[in-house]
């Protein structure tokens, strides 16, 4: 973590912090500084991950264009792997929408069945009352 800082430099920073901030405010300052460092590391890692993902997508698009220019029959194994990854990604994007369509399509059918059941139950109760 402290690549360019030796033990003596850390000791000097600690003593200066103790003199400037005092023993009561130094722990609070250290905690807030470590929180900032953690937040900056998280932000840098998220940016790095997003860039890697974008570069991977760009590489897949370049491979796909190269495959289209060569024709989809005589492909190298790397290009075929890229095409397979793109197909899997496209299928995974389409799947959540299919699940939602099925879920929304089945809910109205089940809600229509419930009033019909209650209607038949009321009808059977009214016939029993008229008989009795």
From Swiss-Prot:
GO cellular component terms, A-Z: TAT protein transport complex
Membrane-spanning residues: 2-22
Transport is among the record's keywords: yes
Stored InterPro entries: TatA/B/E, TatB
Compartments, record wording: Cell inner membrane
GO biological process, alphabetically ordered: protein transport by the Tat complex
Subunit text: The Tat system comprises two distinct complexes: a TatABC complex, containing multiple copies of TatA, TatB and TatC subunits, and a separate TatA complex, containing only TatA subunits. Substrates initially bind to the TatABC complex, which probably triggers association of the separate TatA complex to form the active translocon.
Reported function: Part of the twin-arginine translocation (Tat) system that transports large folded proteins containing a characteristic twin-arginine motif in their signal peptide across membranes. Together with TatC, TatB is part of a receptor directly interacting with Tat signal peptides. TatB may form an oligomeric binding site that transiently accommodates folded Tat precursor proteins before their translocation.
Protein name: Sec-independent protein translocase protein TatB
Organism annotation: Shewanella loihica (strain ATCC BAA-1088 / PV-4)
Organism lineage: Bacteria, Pseudomonadati, Pseudomonadota, Gammaproteobacteria, Alteromonadales
The encoding gene: tatB
């Amino acid at each position: 973590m402290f690549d360019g800082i030796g033990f003596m430099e850390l000791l000097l920073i600690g003593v200066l912090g103790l003199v400037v901030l005092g023993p009561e405010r130094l722990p609070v300052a250290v905690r807030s500084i470590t929180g900032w460092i953690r937040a900056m590391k998280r932000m840098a890692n998220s940016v790095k991950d997003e860039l890697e993902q974008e570069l991977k997508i760009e590489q897949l698009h370049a491979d796909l264009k190269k495959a289209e220019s060569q024709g989809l029959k005589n492909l190298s194994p790397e290009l075929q792997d890229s095409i397979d990854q793109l197909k899997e990604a496209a299928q995974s994007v389409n799947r959540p929408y299919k699940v939602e369509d099925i879920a929304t399509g089945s809910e109205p059918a089940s809600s229509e069945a419930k009033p019909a059941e209650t209607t038949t139950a009321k009808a059977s109760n009214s016939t029993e009352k008229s008989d009795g």
